[in-house]
Amino acid sequence: MAEYVNYVLGSLYVSDTATSTIPTDVRNFIAPPFPLNFWSGPTFTVRSNTRADPLKLVAARHRAAAAAIDTLEAQSQYGVANVDALIRPLERQVAKVADALAALEDAARAAESADAATPQVNASEADQRPDNIGQSLSEIQIAKNDVPMEFDTNLAVDLLATVFVSRAAGGSNGVVFGTWYRALQDRLVTERPVATRSIDYRDGRMSKTFMTTAVVSLQSCGRLYIGNRPYSAFEAAVLCLHLAHRAVNSNYTYPTSFSGLIEQLPVYIEAFSTALGDGTLGKVGYEFNGARLPKNQFHVPGGGGRYERGALNGHGVLETLIRLKVLPAIPGSLGTTSTAVGPELDADQTAYIDDVNKAAAAFLVRAQNLFLTEDQTLLRSTINTITALLLLRRLLWNGNVYTDRLRNNFQLGAIVPNLAVSQRDARGASGGDAAAMVSRSGNNNFTFLCERYVSPIYIANREVELTQLFPGLAALCLDAQTVARDQPQHRAVNVSTGRNQTNLTRLIGIELENRRRTAPVPINEVLAAHDAVALQYERGLGLLMQKPRLRASLEETRRLGQFNVASDYDLLYFVCLGYIPSLTSAM
């Protein structure tokens, strides 16, 4: 039998199929010669050697895996080389930046050394002791019967760190600051748990991070964060008080430097307090016209310089400054800009002469104008600063720091290490000493504070505000809403401190959250929280100044006791630090 199929007509050309006749036959299928035994070949039948195929498959897989490993190794070596080539230029740039930063630090250190070596010009008593100026930059004294203390950048924060370090030396964190701070921390833990992840409040302890943030937040109540101003509200307030004193006292020897003006603040405040009562027939008001002020905003809206007309009216401090011609008339109060002030209102044509700007040029010498009536945000803050100084004078009036030391909750000897108190400075150590010193101190404590505390801190930091100097005063003002709700005949003690400090809790929470977030809280939210606290502080100033028996009302309602204040000595340190620490035994 032939190996290939034989066609009936033999082979044909496909091109001839149109003219050729192909008989019908099953074998006449046009196809190439096809093997007859193709389908029975070994390709389509089961092979007899079944063990050789898996071995070949495994060997092929091994070879493929080895090839893949070799490829990956080559790629990794190539990638390492590329990464090294990319990192080396970055490392060189980082090294250059580090060198530049080191050079800047050296230059800043040299500048600080040069500034420290530059002699300062002071006045009054400071004019007579120039050798002590460099020492006063970092040395302050709060109470007469205590030794001076040196601080770094922020006295309240530095001393707070010392408090926790001294207590932790015994392996314990038993430090308390009163029920007010306890309620504030508990409310923060409850309402803003995200913010409290960075504080340690285990077993009911007071957190150092929380206390530091709270004190800094209290110090920020009187600061202005919008705008670039060459003068602070504290500086403007001192200049206004100085000019007011000159207006009511013609025969007086005045200092020749701004630090000398600060030391004379008690005298200026005393004269201004008298002028406040002389200029009004009724009760002196310490609040602005809230109906015309912007809601929930401290600064002038829209970035302008003026509030709505009449917004600042009604405040006794501002009216007294205008009456004494310390400040010119508020723009628009004596007529429009297109109409000149008539002789019947301003015979000497001096209504708009600003002596504050002249005083700033004489004492501060910064070649910058200071027109408070044009920057009414600064004017508002200045009025609040003067009001706070009046309140501070009332709080410290006739305070006795020489009472029995064991009656004081604040013990400096338990906080400051190696405190060597001489016998001369240890007055008030026994009840007998206190009995021998029953005479009224008047304004002596405030005077000593301005000379040995306020003036040195201002020399060290020219941009300091009053709330940074007295955070405890800011805390009392924020707590004034609680005092305002107490009725005269209502004897129940109000312990709901936390709910009245929603604004402060919010500001503290935002500050703590910003320390943990990679993306900080938007600046608008931070400014809104700060303005809310500033407005509450301003309202508290007015409420406390309206109380005729301020110290008695605060003691009767236990508002001072919630801050651990038990004596005049404690109150003096509280207004300066913002807290009174008490060390407790471990449980």
Swiss-Prot record:
Residue segments, region Disordered: 113-132
Coiled-coil residue windows: none
Gene Ontology CC: host cell; host cell nucleus; viral capsid
Listed GO biological process terms: symbiont entry into host cell; viral genome packaging; viral penetration into host nucleus
Assembly notes: Heterodimerizes with CVC1. Interacts with major capsid protein/MCP and triplex capsid protein 1/TRX1 at the pentamer vertices. Interacts with the large tegument protein/LTP.
Function as written in the Swiss-Prot or TrEMBL entry: Capsid vertex-specific component that plays a role during viral DNA encapsidation, assuring correct genome cleavage and presumably stabilizing capsids that contain full-length viral genomes. Participates in the interaction between the capsid and the tegument through interaction with the large tegument protein/LTP.
Protein name: Capsid vertex component 2
Native source species: Equine herpesvirus 1 (strain V592) (EHV-1)
